[in-house]
């Protein structure tokens, strides 16, 4: 069972403004509302029975985690939800799409992360989603897509890594960003380092490096989509480890706190962009084949995620 650091919990209490405000719900939800909740597979229990990468990630289930989100936007903290969905799937490296047809075309296994954030800014909602695709063998990530939608409009960006370069596509409602297609240097994507962390934290880039920062952060802070110089550090502190990335040019810092032991479950994340801080603290984590649970009667499963 993981434990958040004292520093992290203190920060969340201060952000919420009251020591009585709960910062984290238990990973094992009660089944009082619906007896079927007792049958939901908790990620921590699943990890005990599947202690290696192959058995954990190739069991036909997705790991779904909910984080209590405090998103800074327009200079104010906004409460919301962040959902991380990790799942393996076959991927066509040339077309860079999921391999769905029963043919003999060669594919690669990827660990996909769908990361969403939802929060309100006054009357209107924000919805962020990033999908990243990283081969399970540790070779460079292949693709990242990101969308930011709110009532003013939407923005979409996509990066494809092919033949030693990165193809970039940007579509936006906003004139200053416009519609662009361009190429950039072949560097790692911050948005796909989460999968590397889950596979082998020791393989994460450290020291001086160059990265494409998280695309949602570039969009929210109106920064150019391109590689930036970064400084990265990996620290192990007993049961918990931390991975920190700093971009001096952007005044951006990302800190990911995760369990040192496999499957290196993410405990929390904290982003600081030009003095504004966003935090997410994990509250629930389950294993589920969610794609088969799309009936109205399956909505009870949302309670297993604290939703």
Residue ranges and their predicted role:
Residues 159-206:
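Surface-exposed beta-loop interaction hotspot
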Residues 22-167, 202-307:
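Acidic, serine/threonine-rich low-complexity disordered tracts
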Residues 1-6:
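Bacterial N-terminal signal peptides that target proteins for export
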